[in-house]
Amino acid sequence: MPPRCPFLRHLFFLLLLLSPWIMSPCGGAADDVTYPIVPSSPGRRSILQIRREPPTEPNTKLVVDRDGKVFLKQQPKETPYWSFSTGSPMHSLYQAPANNNTENATEITRPHIIVEYLNNSKAATTVDGYHNWTVQEFFRQKPLVTDDGVTLGSETTSAYLVDGRSGRLIHVYKSTGDTKITNALVKPASTEDFVNEPLLIRRTDSKLEHFSKTTGKLVWNLTVSHFRAALLCDPVFNSGYDLGPKLQTGIYMPLLCGSQIDVRGPEIVIRVLHDQPMNVKMLPSPSLNHFESENSIMPFGKARESRKLQEQHKQKYTYLFGQWSPVKLLAPLVLLGVVVSVFIKKFSSRGSDVSLKAGPSKKKKNRKSAKDTNRQSVPRGQDQFELIEGGQMLLGFNNFQSGATDGRKIGKLFLSSKEIAKGSNGTVVFEGIYEGRPVAVKRLVRSHHEVAFKEIQNLIASDQHTNIIRWYGVEYDQDFVYLSLERCTCSLDDLIKSYLEFSMTKVLENNDSTEGVAAYKIQLDSLEGVIKGNNFWKVGGHPSPLMLKLMRDIVCGIVHLHELGIVHRDLKPQNVLISKDMTLSAKLSDMGISKRMSRDMSSLGHLATGSGSSGWQAPEQLLQGRQTRAVDMFSLGCVIFYTITGCKHPFGDDLERDVNIVKNKVDLFLVEHVPEASDLISRLLNPDPDLRPSATEVLLHPMFWNSEMRLSFLRDASDRVELENREADSEILKAMESTAPVAIGGKWDEKLEPVFITNIGRYRRYKYDSIRDLLRVIRNKLNHHRELPPEIQELVGTVPEGFDEYFAVRFPKLLIEVYRVISLHCREEEVFRKYFKCDII
């Protein structure tokens, strides 16, 4: 017998001694008294505190009335706690006027359809000549062909983001894109944009339209609305006992955080004339799922199912142990656990001794830690609100089946162990697959759930924009929150460094190990397909059209965020991601510390929580001053400088940047060869936030103009100053000519070829120190390019790119100096509005 058998024998005798005491009841029938199972979720009391009040039902409920107004009501008195309107009634019915003027008309035609609301105590009555349908039965029949026409169905969805505590309407999402209705519904709010209990009410309007088979005209249409609610907060906000977050003392939300429920409304019966058959010649089409069955779209929240499971546990508990005192039950179980743990310890130690003596194993086995096992066994909280796309909530199981073993499944997410990037506060980004699509999985420590859900809220608000990273869903386990985000190729920082072939000597100078160098080579190799065939700089260091396009993408993303009232607050090259489709595009990401301002707010105040990254923050952020949208514009200036100069910073090296930002010690020498960039960056880095341009103004800056627009502006400017009289002391002409030393740098004929000067001298005389005369030359040669001699055409190049480059190389500061004068004196004139107004460009 093996040496550990005596220990097993002792354990067996001990269990025999304990078994009579364990199995004998204290008296009384086992079915008389039951004890509820205590949930083992974090933050609740231990099993020693098992005596507690039984869980109570929610004392509030969400309902909707006939007018489409959603209420949170306290039970049992049905007292409204808050309410908001969704803008239109629950149902609408239109019936075309009947034609009763024909010769055969003997009686007034009855309506095809009658819609009736039922009270709780009223049953659906029958009406002669009509057949009663429930909403589910009626809408399940679409589309169809009847003897008198065709019935078609459609569906639109709206989502209303509400503060669950106050009922304040935060935002409206409409699949129809009706921004006028959206703006009319949302009232300005002065409170903090982030709320702990964001409640999303989804309204689905299902519409049937019946058209006459003979005339093709609309006979009738019927629209009925269905409401669904999802509470988007983290489950840690739940109050326990299967109750949602507490609104005030004794009042709780009717659903748990992360769950969804139907919003109940008045019951409707639809009466249809018998001569309107509803069950013939069905046309193939997807049904209106939310009318098929309540569980086919979204099961009810966890509260109801968990109570059923709890009742089953209570029965098993009573049947197995009888009417036992919890303390008497606990003592032998604890003792038994101690004995078993001692046994396991001895067994494992002896087993390890044997394995050491036997030598190393020939076959390694994959073993998972207890922590990983727990993560895999953690049930998926409740019906999670996974995805908003085009205003609709998309649910369902993930059909993805991966043969990969290097990862694990969390709800709908397959999380790979391959790490993409690391961030602050324990944030790590992994590869993953969510509902069959490759995603980047941002893993945040669960204690930072506010950051995660704030990021989700702002990603939802800014969804569907090509320059904002897409959010697909969220999953949880015991320790982390997992955000499934759009998968991109690399960051802007990686792209620039890879393109410049960030040398190995630079890596070695930073004291990286040989392994680090090897890893960086792998990174460069992985991006070779992205940078191959793309040019980011022209000869001479000017940004290429592709680089300008990427920087314009960044600005477009900021414009979109600022229009929504969202301030990013952490803009830097690492948070700009690059996506490769037909061409490269830039997308803003990492909105964990972003803030959303209501419409009547101009700033975030002096104590806005969270801070951006060192070296990329505006001075008012570093000094904890009043923060506005201008903080993003300062960071944008640093990013543009960093991109154009190839990873250089306008405020110096890493350690000195914050100090230099506060002292306004900026060095723009490296971009002075690109005057348009130098002008824009200097304005963006202005220490006074009120003097920085807005995102829309940046988008219209000459730095982002193409050759055609640059030439068009110079031609319009020439036309404008051509009629000005020098003797009349023209302000605009004086301002224009005063910039000549900078814009021209001497006499402009000295910078043009003799053959070109000879050609223009045939027609008129010019003043070679005058900007007006130089603009006249550019305008005339541009307007008559086809009539120029072949040698002159070859010299100035093709229109517009070649022609623009010819003069831009010789007079690099001409455009920006003329732009400044026109901006100051003529920006409101009709001819120049397209260069300064976003609604025109």
From Swiss-Prot:
UniProt keywords, alphabetically: ATP-binding, Disulfide bond, Endoplasmic reticulum, Glycoprotein, Hydrolase, Immunity, Kinase, Magnesium, Membrane, Metal-binding, mRNA processing, mRNA splicing, Multifunctional enzyme, Nucleotide-binding, Serine/threonine-protein kinase, Signal, Transcription, Transcription regulation, Transferase, Transmembrane, Transmembrane helix, Unfolded protein response
Membrane-crossing segments per the record: 324-344
Cofactor(s) needed by this chain: Mg(2+)
Listed SUPFAM superfamilies: Protein kinase-like (PK-like)
GO biological process: one example: immune system process
Signal peptide: 1-30
Glycosylation positions in this chain: N100, N104, N119, N132, N221
Membrane topology: Single-pass type I membrane protein
Record text on activity regulation: The kinase domain is activated by trans-autophosphorylation. Kinase activity is required for activation of the endoribonuclease domain.
Observed phenotype of the null mutant: No visible phenotype but shows enhanced susceptibility to a bacterial pathogen and deficiency in establishing systemic acquired resistance (SAR). Ire1a and ire1b double mutant is more sensitive to the ER stress inducer tunicamycin than the wild-type and is enable to give rise to the spliced bZIP60 mRNA form. Ire1a and ire1b double mutant displays short roots and a ER stress-sensitive phenotype.
Keyword Signal attributed: yes
Keyword 4Fe-4S in annotation: no
Topological domain ranges for the Lumenal compartment: 31-323
A Pfam family recorded for this sequence: Pkinase
Domain KEN: 707-838
Top-level taxon: Eukaryota
GO cellular component, one term: extrinsic component of endoplasmic reticulum membrane
PANTHER family in UniProt: IRE1-RELATED, NON-SPECIFIC SERINE_THREONINE PROTEIN KINASE
Family the UniProt entry places it in: Belongs to the protein kinase superfamily. Ser/Thr protein kinase family.
Protein known as: Serine/threonine-protein kinase/endoribonuclease IRE1a
Source species of the chain: Arabidopsis thaliana
Gene from which the chain derives: IRE1A
